[in-house]
Amino acid sequence: MTLSGSSSASDMSGQTVLSADDADIDVVGEGDEPLDKDSECGSPAGHAEEADELGGKEIARSPSGSANEAEGKGESQQQEGMQNKPKNSLVKPPYSYIALITMAILQSPQKKLTLSGICEFISNRFPYYREKFPAWQNSIRHNLSLNDCFVKIPREPGNPGKGNYWTLDPQSEDMFDNGSFLRRRKRFKRQQPDSLREQTALMMQSFGAYSLAGPYGRPYGLHPAAYTHPAALQYPYIPPVGPMLPPAVPLLPSSELSRKAFSSQLSPSLQLQLSSLSSTAASIIKSEPSSRPSFSIENIIGVSAASSIAPQTFLRPPVTVQSALMSHQPLALSRSTAAIGPILSVPTNLISGQFLPTAAAAVAKWPAQ
């Protein structure tokens, strides 16, 4: 600390002496500036600082320059590669498959082509589809079969070859707007001819309850009155088809069959036969021995109720009689006799043996109390 202090003091004294001498010579003080500049330039510290600054600038400039040069070389190489590389990326044509098929059919002399002919035209006309073949062939096939604007024509017997011909529907000529294949109007739908429509209406009316015009077969939103076609008036002799199976016949007692409302429709002989059958069944039930256990239907609701329930349990009216009850229409005597005769001709002993259980079997089934 003493050395630095003494040196600084001597410097200060030297500066004061020089300043005092210079005060007489140079009053303005212009001579100080060149002295300072010369001292700064002549000092080694100043040279070192300048060298460091220049070196830093050169280092800062050198990476950016090398990066720019590398980018320029990379771009030039890419451009050269693009020029030397062939153009394989082809653009897909802006036409739909329907438009392509229509082009192929219209350019043919006979206005009809097979599937292979349509694909050949598209491949020759558009290089994009030539490279992608046969990936789009199924799309052409689906468009031919799903669109009404294309009509399939069977191949003639004498014309050898494979596949059917396809042509355009005459009513679909204006499906493209102003003849431009880029703009297509709404989806074309083939109209049904009037003659075919009348035949369809006749078939629908002739099927009756199972027809498409029935309550469960007509299209949604159409009233049944909409199907009153003139064909029904032209052919009044075609009856509607009734149900294939008769309705289910519930079991009715013989007393129900012998009521006034129904007995007036049957002949006296049938009434006598039915009444005799019911009385025979009742007598068989009453004649059973009373050696039954205490728990029985007779003890709960009485013997009279059991006798009235027994015919209801074991007797079943014929189908024709029940249908007469349901429809309230008189039956012919011959049909009724032919239908009921086999049932009424069965002997009573067979009925009692087959349908009525014996007392011994009934006792064996119930536990003894």
From Swiss-Prot:
Compositional bias segments (type: Low complexity): 1-13
GO biological process, one term: transcription by RNA polymerase II
Entry's localization field: Nucleus
Protein name per Swiss-Prot or TrEMBL: Forkhead box protein D3
Gene encoding the protein: foxd3
Chain's role: Transcriptional repressor that is an essential upstream regulator of neural crest determination. Also acts in a negative auto-regulator loop by inhibiting the transcription of its own gene.
Lineage: Eukaryota, Metazoa, Chordata, Craniata, Vertebrata
Gene3D superfamilies in UniProt: Winged helix-like DNA-binding domain superfamily/Winged helix DNA-binding domain
Presence of keyword Transport: no
InterPro entries: FH_FOXD3, Fork_head_dom, FOX_domain-containing, TF_fork_head_CS_1, TF_fork_head_CS_2, WH-like_DNA-bd_sf, WH_DNA-bd_sf
